[in-house]
């Protein structure tokens, strides 16, 4: 499970715990670790213009896909070394900034990452980014699920429509689904944008994806 831009917080730990109750070992890494230990932000991180938001953005804007793929390799090695975790296929899912990371992982490690999901992922079509998901769909062997909010300035419908066309042309296995009437962040229970029906659908689709592909 890959974090969104505001970083590691209790809300994400709760979501990881919920997934664990379905029978999965869940890793929730701090992807900002390269910036040092002081990368857990206060509630003000969600307020544009706040000092915490600016501090987070100074780290977030330096994030790119290739280093995160190196982190995924380390996580796969860690999973293999833990006796209590079954070896074999793994799933990766991400929210917001980590949506493209999850999809890129399925392309970079196609024999290991057999299921990947993006929820309101940003920059899924980015011609300037190495390993942008829209370029690597054809390398994926597993199943992908991409869930987009109908109202999302960070992932507008123009991008989603282009993504759908490229996804279909790639022949990749999976689905792109638009959640009607909801906004970016709909799955986060502690945020103003939370939408319970869409959030519960997110859990249903994620867990069913993993059950199909991780057994």
Describe each PLM feature range.
Residues 1-215:
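N-terminal cap/leader regions of alpha/beta-hydrolase-fold enzymes
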């Amino acid at each position: 499970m890959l974090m969104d831009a505001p970083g590691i917080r209790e809300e994400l730990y709760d979501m990881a715990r919920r997934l664990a109750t379905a029978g999965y070992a869940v890793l929730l890494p701090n992807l900002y670790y390269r910036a040092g230990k002081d990368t857990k932000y206060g509630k003000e991180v969600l307020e544009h213009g706040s000092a915490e938001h600016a501090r987070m953005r100074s780290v977030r804007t330096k994030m790119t896909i290739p280093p995160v793929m190196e982190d995924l390799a380390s996580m796969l090695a860690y999973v293999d070394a833990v006796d209590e975790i079954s070896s074999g296929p793994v799933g990766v899912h991400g929210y917001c900034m980590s949506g493209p990371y999850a999809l890129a992982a399925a392309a970079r490690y196609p024999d290991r990452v057999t299921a990947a999901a993006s929820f309101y992922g940003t920059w899924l079509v980015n011609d300037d980014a190495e390993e942008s998901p829209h370029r690597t769909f054809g390398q994926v062997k597993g199943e992908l699920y991409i869930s987009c909010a109908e109202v999302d300035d960070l992932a507008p419908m123009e991008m989603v429509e282009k993504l759908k066309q490229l996804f279909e042309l790639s022949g990749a296995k999976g689905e792109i689904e638009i959640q009607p009437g909801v906004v970016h962040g709909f799955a986060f229970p502690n945020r103003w944008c939370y939408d319970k029906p869409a959030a519960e659908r997110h859990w249903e689709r994620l867990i069913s994806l993993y059950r199909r592909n991780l057994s």
